[in-house]
Amino acid sequence: MQSERYQAGAAKFEEVYPRQASEDPDEFERMAMENLFSEYGTRQGLSTRDRRLLILGIVAAQGNDAILKLQFGAGIAMGDLSESDLTEIPIFVSQYAGFPLSVVANAAASKVKEGLSN
């Protein structure tokens, strides 16, 4: 049986991502559910879309292709992002993070768009 914090975090995780939290989590996942999703993810003030846009901005500035694809895909799947967001976000990123990093964001968004066409 998982802690109440884990259960609250897992419930929030499942609102944010199109998959279920593990019933038998390793230590890293347990900590993520209990802290990131339970403590921070359930705070009032920012919507799931707001949080996703912040994450996208941060990981775009880092050039983190894997998390960009994860967040773009989850945003589409969970209804937080539209297909036009996949075009506009990399364009906007180009002005704040620079063109080379916006190319990484655009490539990740394009990969997710390709999946929508199939």
Regions found by a protein language model. Give the residues of each.
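Acidic, glycine/proline-rich low-complexity segments that act as flexible tails and inter-domain linkers
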Residues: 1-49, 69-72, 77, 101-118
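Amphipathic alpha-helical core segments of compact helical bundles
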Residues: 37, 59, 91-98
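Short, structured motif recognition centered on aromatic/hydrophobic residues
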Residues: 51-59, 89
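Short helix-coil transition sites and intra-membrane helix breaks within transmembrane domains
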Residues: 62-66, 98-101
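Mid-chain, well-packed structural core segment of small domains
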Residues: 64-87
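C-terminal structural segments of small proteins and small subunits
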Residues: 87, 94-107
